[in-house]
Amino acid sequence: MLFTSYAFIAFIAVAFFLYYRIPRKWQWPFLLIISIGFYASAGIFYPIFLLVSSAVTYLAGLWIERNRKQEKTYIRENAGQFASRQEKKEFKQKGEKRRRNLMVSALLILLAVLGVFKYADFVIDNMNAVFYAVGSDRELEYLDLLLPMGISFYTFQSLGYLLDVYWEKIDAQKNFFKHLLFVSFFPQLVQGPISRYSDLSQTLYEEHVFDKKQVIFGLERILWGYFKKLVVADTILTATTSFLKY
């Protein structure tokens, strides 16, 4: 569903109307439902990858934060049991190593999934070229995987969240569905931008009342964006495409 399509305009109009008609406590769950529905409209199985990415970073973030709090509590309550500052330092280093290992493992899992979808056939193509160059008849079959829409955006947004938790810039989100909304929020799911949790979360989760001035301001920004896309960018694309043909 392209942002410039009539289907998307109809979708956003209905979503906007319902968002301000439902009880305000249900606004963020409503955003989650329509975001998942929006993504599923591109491919019924696509939300599975979105859920996996969200679950990995959600669970890893919770464990990292909980482990750090438990470590601090243990040190505070058992400060006298450490024989020296060096022993206390080594204890903290062991805890930090466990948290770092989990964080790196989560990063590698998500990057591996992204890499398989984006670069598996590229790697296979180069390996086949090497086989051909050395005179081998061996040829690997292409995977022909269909790249899930927006997987790069939500993968890096999920990883950004996890890194912020690890660096103690934010608290881990305790509600999985709120975390899922942050990862899957439909206006940025396909074309970005990649947002920081600290910048977006409060706006997503808080209750909103209809504000005419804000709505007009939002419509002005949308129309300006459409102008830049349909009039400026598409015109330049047509001109450059024609130029590059010659």
Predicted regions and their residues:
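Membrane-embedded transmembrane alpha-helical bundles that form the catalytic cores
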Residues: 1-246
